[in-house]
């Protein structure tokens, strides 16, 4: 059972593989952002989607220890931690090589996530055995997804381009909301006794890709490939969302599009 204070249901995909997908895919996309002005932002966005899927799985694992009411809370908290890690990572360019900035942002976000989780267990008395691990994962996923989408908008992950294209414009605030919803919504929508990882992650892919389509629009006037980012994001969203809906139909006892459910004696 996925939401009965007993932890998540069985996983079809090991968490280690999803972590590898999020970290390696996210970092690869960020580093590729400046390779080419056309394909770079697309790769950065795809890397961000990889991180979102990783974060959604971590949300699924930690939020299964309860009724699911804390899903939005840990989502917003962890993405805010991730953004702090991103900003600190960008500022670290004054003490570390520029190529290390994404890794520093990831590490700082995950460390801060662990600190906040420890405070939650010690002060708030949250009795979740995997709180530290999952909060660190969600914060790291948030950092990579925000940095990936920011690089897609700005065209690179350098401090100056981020300040000019993402922070000064206020897009960083929009990315906070956008990435939070993309990471926390999948489990929030699928939680329940019959929740399973595969269906939840299909929805996570769809929220990641629709976010990618929106990020492309934010790049209008900032990078020449904004339309390609939006187009690929929208097409992939259609594929992912259809897969999610199909999985929901297959696993549902029955489907009713409108009106009230029939009474038992009317079946």
From Swiss-Prot:
<feature type="transmembrane region" description="Helical">
    <location>
        <begin position="138"/>
        <end position="158"/>
    </location>
</feature>
<dbReference type="GO" id="GO:0030269">
    <property type="term" value="F:tetrahydromethanopterin S-methyltransferase activity"/>
</dbReference>
<keyword id="KW-0489">Methyltransferase</keyword>
<dbReference type="GO" id="GO:0005886">
    <property type="term" value="C:plasma membrane"/>
</dbReference>
<keyword id="KW-1278">Translocase</keyword>
<keyword id="KW-1133">Transmembrane helix</keyword>
<dbReference type="InterPro" id="IPR005865">
    <property type="entry name" value="THM_MeTrfase_su_C"/>
</dbReference>
<feature type="transmembrane region" description="Helical">
    <location>
        <begin position="99"/>
        <end position="119"/>
    </location>
</feature>
<dbReference type="GO" id="GO:0019386">
    <property type="term" value="P:methanogenesis, from carbon dioxide"/>
</dbReference>
<dbReference type="GO" id="GO:0032259">
    <property type="term" value="P:methylation"/>
</dbReference>
<feature type="transmembrane region" description="Helical">
    <location>
        <begin position="76"/>
        <end position="96"/>
    </location>
</feature>
<keyword id="KW-0812">Transmembrane</keyword>
<dbReference type="GO" id="GO:0034708">
    <property type="term" value="C:methyltransferase complex"/>
</dbReference>
<feature type="transmembrane region" description="Helical">
    <location>
        <begin position="39"/>
        <end position="59"/>
    </location>
</feature>
<keyword id="KW-0554">One-carbon metabolism</keyword>
<dbReference type="Pfam" id="PF04211">
    <property type="entry name" value="MtrC"/>
</dbReference>
<comment type="pathway">
    <text>One-carbon metabolism; methanogenesis from CO(2); methyl-coenzyme M from 5,10-methylene-5,6,7,8-tetrahydromethanopterin: step 2/2.</text>
</comment>
<feature type="transmembrane region" description="Helical">
    <location>
        <begin position="18"/>
        <end position="38"/>
    </location>
</feature>
<comment type="function">
    <text>Part of a complex that catalyzes the formation of methyl-coenzyme M and tetrahydromethanopterin from coenzyme M and methyl-tetrahydromethanopterin. This is an energy-conserving, sodium-ion translocating step.</text>
</comment>
<comment type="subunit">
    <text>The complex is composed of 8 subunits; MtrA, MtrB, MtrC, MtrD, MtrE, MtrF, MtrG and MtrH.</text>
</comment>
<feature type="transmembrane region" description="Helical">
    <location>
        <begin position="209"/>
        <end position="229"/>
    </location>
</feature>
<feature type="transmembrane region" description="Helical">
    <location>
        <begin position="230"/>
        <end position="250"/>
    </location>
</feature>
<keyword id="KW-0472">Membrane</keyword>
<comment type="similarity">
    <text>Belongs to the MtrC family.</text>
</comment>
<keyword id="KW-1003">Cell membrane</keyword>
<dbReference type="GO" id="GO:0006730">
    <property type="term" value="P:one-carbon metabolic process"/>
</dbReference>
<feature type="transmembrane region" description="Helical">
    <location>
        <begin position="163"/>
        <end position="183"/>
    </location>
</feature>
<keyword id="KW-0808">Transferase</keyword>
<keyword id="KW-0484">Methanogenesis</keyword>
<protein>
    <recommendedName>
        <fullName>Tetrahydromethanopterin S-methyltransferase subunit C</fullName>
        <ecNumber>7.2.1.4</ecNumber>
    </recommendedName>
</protein>
